[in-house]
Amino acid sequence: MAFNDLLLQLGGVGRFQKIQVTLVILPLILLASHNTLQNFTAAIPTHHCRPPADTNLSEDGDLEAWLPRDGQGRPESCLLFTSPQRGPPFPNGTETNGTGATEPCPHGWIYDNSTFPSTIVTEWDLVCSHRALRQLAQSLYMMGVLLGAMTFGCLADRLGRRKVLIFNYLQTAVSGTCAAFAPNFPAYCAFRFLSGMSTAGVVLNCMTLNVEWMPIHTRAYVGTLTGYVYSLGQFLLAGMAYAVPHWRYLQLLVSAPFFAFFIYSWFFIESARWYASSGRLDLTLRNLQRVAWINGKQEEGANLSMEALQASLKKELTTGKSQASALELIRCPALRRLFLCLSMLWFATSFAYYGLVMDLQGFGVSIYLIQVIFGAVDLPAKLVSFLVINNVGRRPAQMASLLLAGICILINGVVPKDKSIVRTSLAVLGKGCLASSFNCIFLYTGEVYPTMIRQTGLGMGSTLARVGSIVSPLVSMTAELYPSVPLFIYGAVPVAASAAIALLPETLGQPLPDTVQDVENRRRGKTRKQQEELQKQMVPLQASAQVKN
């Protein structure tokens, strides 16, 4: 009897699974807010240079006399006349309203606070020559996510999913709250970096802890539900940012609830599958009996003895006592193939995804509306993804989502700028496909890696995703060469990466592999049941050989 059979015997999707899955995925609502928070906390309002202190700002003429005009007749954002220019304005706004010398804003800036009363941009003047610092803050957050994925993925395979998850909740709460009270920009960046580390750990361990407690036939449901909860977080972020436009209060609003998540996470039950893979049979038995009691299967739990558990999980116990390191992903041929292919998928999905979602102000419409639309498109996209994942397979779902996303982005690159509705529609469709790709790849990665290195594999995949999210803003700088170059790159990468899916196994309806040998058998087309039958056939042959000897 394999581990999946034990779960079914002890209630399948019982009261325990429903309660723990709900509590584990609840923090993901606010996790979506952390990832794209700077769309609002670092929004750039309309601004222009502040004139000298003795200027009468209540008089439009006095203010206009200090402000040069750009080619479209708008005030320059980063230049100020060295002396007021009182001459009449030029017609059609084609030239500046004076011929005097200009200088970068020596007295600071005046911001339009009608939409964004307070952001890190307005508080620390991250505009003009300091504009790159705004992107630096987001890049540092993503670097934190990258380091967190590398660190907490490996730690969870060694220390357990529950312990690492509890620590991640606390770190997110503390670092996020400290960021809300940051006295200066360097301190803000440091706390955001720490927040990024912990949010990566939350995502990885939430998904793994849930998957390892669920029977085979329900894993796709859990993966899709997790994706929907993340999408709900995008809706919630738009509403919270609209209701709480001050960046410090918004930062605190999405961080403080993690103190509550930290408190109730102490009641989570550690993965019995991880205990078994670690060779800790006593704790495996204890947790399975606790789950049986919660699910109302007291008799089945009482009948589950140490001997029965050893017989059921013989292979897990004999092969899982040695902990695997991240180097196994490269050393072992079977794992190396999975690692390389999945790395391309993780990188491509995140690279294109953040290329779209971190440039909401570039659409030319309300940033709150775009945030809601980007969240809304996930609902039908993930429903279609779920149906394909659960009925057709993981591979078709992953390939279709990446290909369609890349094609939509590539088409967007050739659509004229004045076709804003068409461009926005294609971007929204592409974003929905990329959200579906994320939904699938989290589930898919957890199913192809063996238990002994599953969390490490997820962590390395998330690491590659973070590399994509860090590189993505740099690619946007190629727009200076030609406006559509970033879109061509964002579209080409997922299309090219989709070819790697052909080298991955289908996992629909398959048991989770526990060892590297399971991965090898799957690659060779052998199921666990076939292996057990082969071993049974070998027993009489071995006995016959012993008699002859």
Curated annotation (Swiss-Prot):
Annotated region (Disordered), positions in chain: 521-549
Stretches in topological domain Cytoplasmic: 1-23, 157-164, 217-224, 270-337, 390-395, 447-456, 506-549
Subcellular location, record wording: Basolateral cell membrane; Basal cell membrane
Disulfide bond positions: none
Gene Ontology biological-process annotations: alpha-ketoglutarate transport; organic anion transport; prostaglandin transport; renal tubular secretion
SUPFAM superfamilies: MFS general substrate transporter (SSF103473)
Top-level taxon of the source organism: Eukaryota
Catalytic activity: (6R)-L-erythro-5,6,7,8-tetrahydrobiopterin(out) + a dicarboxylate(in) = (6R)-L-erythro-5,6,7,8-tetrahydrobiopterin(in) + a dicarboxylate(out); L-erythro-7,8-dihydrobiopterin(out) + a dicarboxylate(in) = L-erythro-7,8-dihydrobiopterin(in) + a dicarboxylate(out); L-sepiapterin(out) + a dicarboxylate(in) = L-sepiapterin(in) + a dicarboxylate(out); prostaglandin F2alpha(out) + a dicarboxylate(in) = prostaglandin F2alpha(in) + a dicarboxylate(out)
Post-translation changes: Glycosylated. Glycosylation is necessary for proper targeting of the transporter to the plasma membrane.
Keyword Transcription: no
UniProt entry keywords in alphabetical sequence: Cell membrane, Glycoprotein, Membrane, Transmembrane, Transmembrane helix
Alphabetized InterPro entries for the sequence: MFS_dom (IPR020846), MFS_sugar_transport-like (IPR005828), MFS_trans_sf (IPR036259), Orgcat_transp/SVOP (IPR004749)
Membrane topology, as annotated: Multi-pass membrane protein
Cellular component terms per the entry's GO annotation: basal plasma membrane; basolateral plasma membrane; plasma membrane
Residue ranges crossing the lipid bilayer per the database entry: 24-44, 136-156, 165-185, 196-216, 225-245, 249-269, 338-358, 369-389, 396-416, 426-446, 457-477, 485-505
Record bears the keyword RNA-binding: no
Sugar attachment sites: N56, N92, N113
GO function terms (MF aspect): alpha-ketoglutarate transmembrane transporter activity; antiporter activity; organic anion transmembrane transporter activity; prostaglandin transmembrane transporter activity; sodium-independent organic anion transmembrane transporter activity; solute:inorganic anion antiporter activity; transmembrane transporter activity; xenobiotic transmembrane transporter activity
Function: Secondary active transporter that functions as a Na(+)-independent organic anion (OA)/dicarboxylate antiporter where the uptake of one molecule of OA into the cell is coupled with an efflux of one molecule of intracellular dicarboxylate such as 2-oxoglutarate or glutarate. Mediates the uptake of OA across the basolateral side of proximal tubule epithelial cells, thereby contributing to the renal elimination of endogenous OA from the systemic circulation into the urine.
Domain text: Multiple cysteine residues are necessary for proper targeting to the plasma membrane.
Family from the record: Belongs to the major facilitator (TC 2.A.1) superfamily. Organic cation transporter (TC 2.A.1.19) family.
Name listed for the protein in its UniProt record: Solute carrier family 22 member 6
